[in-house]
Amino acid sequence: MIETLIAGLTCGIATFYGMGDGFHGQRTANGERFDAYRWTAAHPYLPMGSKIRVTNQDNGKQVIVRVNDRGPYSHADLDLSYSAFAHIESTHKGNATVCWRVVA
């Protein structure tokens, strides 16, 4: 994990979940059903419902996601839903160097 914090900006590695792994339709940590096609995220400690702007550091693409789950349970710092990750990086790559900031 490379998670670093600079003046409210956190950087690290993002991965995705919800496609082909059995999570789509399952309950998230806040009790709602996980939808791989909504822009959501799993984070270990940000408050549920927080909205964060995630920026891919390689291409500048951004997505705003809502934290609705806990995790990640991999080597990453942030787990994005399949759709949110696909908006900022090819899912074939599997991970991305990102920075994020709470916006709401």
Regions found by a protein language model. Give the residues of each.
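Secreted/periplasmic proteins
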Residues: 2-104
